[in-house]
Amino acid sequence: MAAEARRPVLVVLHQEHSTPGRVGLRLAARGHPLDVRRPRFGDVLPETLDGHAGAIVFGGPMSINDPDDFLKRETDWLAVPLKENAPLLGLCLGAQMLARHLGAAVGTHADGHIEIGWFGLTATSAGEALTRWPDRVHQFHREGFGLPAGATLLAEGSAETFPNQAFSYGPAAFAIQFHIELTTAMVNRWTQRIGDRARLPGGQAAHLHFEGRALHDWKTSTFLDAFLDIWLGRDSRQGRAAAE
């Protein structure tokens, strides 16, 4: 008898032509179809995740502090996976949405610092207990988040700029500020749009993005495989296996 088809993963994207990158490729390799939705362009998010293995909310150039209605709707919608204890992952903007939903502040650095390029990362003891984390990661953000009450900090950046880099909340929700989804093609597109931001505090020129990728991206790739298995394995709804 053929194995039961695996449940799809809900993928929330914020630009018309954006993709889930290698996160999507790794999920597809595990047999999970991708249910891609773009609420910014009118797609409706589901009222339940009962038919999904989990949900991933990706990043985008907008700010959670922008007045657009779709940002508030998405942030409010996070109550659905949180209530159901469905696996939930927020990446970059998605991480900031989760932090905001849980009551934490999200905003720019007081001295105008940004993180665009490769920066150091240190796992906390809780993070080390979860898996092995990369020690340098690819960042592309101008805002950071506070640690929500009841959340567990998993990874830290610089104490002077953006110290909170990853956290977990409850049994199955995770937020990661840095980018684990980037393919080389995505880096090429993104670095073409850096412009004057490379001259801001914490901005790096395009060639440094590729140098960092050549030196350090293998660690993020290894982390991604391990983390996805852990994340999918957190699905305890009705005792079912997350991989179904």
Regions found by a protein language model. Give the residues of each.
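N-terminal beta1-alpha1 cap of cysteine-dependent amidohydrolase-like domains
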Residues: 1-68, 73-84, 198-244
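Hydrophobic/aromatic beta-strand patches that form the interior of the parallel beta-sheet core
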Residues: 10, 35-37, 56, 89, ...
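Short amphipathic alpha-helical segments
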Residues: 23-25, 68-70, 102-103, 150-151, ...
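Cysteine-nucleophile active-site neighborhood
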Residues: 52-53, 57-126
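Tryptophan-centric aromatic hotspots in well-structured domains and transmembrane helices
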Residues: 85, 118-119, 140, 190, ...
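Pocket-forming structural segment of enzyme catalytic cores
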Residues: 102-185
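C-terminal helical/coil "lid" or tail adjacent to the Rossmann-like core of SAM-dependent
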Residues: 171-210
